[in-house]
From Swiss-Prot:
Key words of the record: Metal-binding, NAD, Oxidoreductase, Zinc
Transmembrane segments annotated in the record for this chain: none
Keyword tRNA-binding in record: no
Enzyme Commission code(s) on record: 1.1.1.1
Record-given protein name: Probable zinc-binding alcohol dehydrogenase Rv1895
Annotated organism of origin: Mycobacterium tuberculosis (strain ATCC 25618 / H37Rv)
Cofactor binding, per record: Binds 2 Zn(2+) ions per subunit.
Cofactor(s) demanded: Zn(2+)
UniProt cross-references to SUPFAM superfamilies, sorted A to Z: GroES-like (SSF50129), NAD(P)-binding Rossmann-fold domains (SSF51735)
SMART domains cross-referenced by the UniProt entry: PKS_ER
GO molecular function, one term: alcohol dehydrogenase (NAD+) activity
Amino acid sequence: MRAVVIDGAGSVRVNTQPDPALPGPDGVVVAVTAAGICGSDLHFYEGEYPFTEPVALGHEAVGTIVEAGPQVRTVGVGDLVMVSSVAGCGVCPGCETHDPVMCFSGPMIFGAGVLGGAQADLLAVPAADFQVLKIPEGITTEQALLLTDNLATGWAAAQRADISFGSAVAVIGLGAVGLCALRSAFIHGAATVFAVDRVKGRLQRAATWGATPIPSPAAETILAATRGRGADSVIDAVGTDASMSDALNAVRPGGTVSVVGVHDLQPFPVPALTCLLRSITLRMTMAPVQRTWPELIPLLQSGRLDVDGIFTTTLPLDEAAKGYATARARSGEELRFCLRPDSRDVLGAHETVDLYVHVRRCQSVADLQLEGAADGVDGPSMLN
């Protein structure tokens, strides 16, 4: 199969590597039909989180299940599914909350060096009943991709921002997560949303969605617009020292700063005394992806939550390097990139998913026969 791998800062390529094996009896293998290039992927691309060896990238995937373990109950071969970007074990008390971040064994993210990357022809997914959801009726591919990460993150940011009806909210950073947070803030009752970014095109996009655009840094402008009071809630969807400082300066006394932007590995000096004296609540979170699905899917199906237009560019998987280079520019016109592996490349000469699965099983039997012959064991009997 093909997979997008990173060799170092500013260098990604499409690599050919072995197809993934079924990751245990509770896992599935997904033939990826769409994968997103996320802002978090750009952190790897820009060298903020260096790897010691090439790593397959991507954590947002939609695709068709081509193999499922015998313990999988909620999905099956042939189902079109979305895969949570954050994986948990699925069985611990933390995972029982449907929040993978609470996993007692520690959440894992696809495309970060431990699990496989979603920007590939095939993706092995462990604990599939916890990680994977069959795409409901009325949900588009683009919406499903957003549900795997960005929309879940933006929604969680708004939930944790203590937004009350009629309040003023600021969203710093108008990438995909920030725009999803903007939409979510309105649904949670905000009367005014200040949309903050450096890129003119992104500010214009936010204005068409009903927000008040403000170039960053925005604290002084927000204070002036609120007669010196400050925003009731501020969502930091950037994750830099500058954006965090702007958020803390823009929030009112007693307000809440909700941080979902991914910071680098350097420590940030939190002004603890200022937060104490102004009674500021500071919260940070990763996306509780699976927990948000029952809330977000009905909103999307009803049309109350509209996130259309966030994915602006679609490219074949082989043009991933072009997508990363363009995404790095962070223009106002091209916001999010969708990579499309060709299912014909996944299936090879096999025309159907069923035939592809049959061939994979035959290959597994052949492999076991070879192993068994070396040990004096009948291969097929090992499958029983």
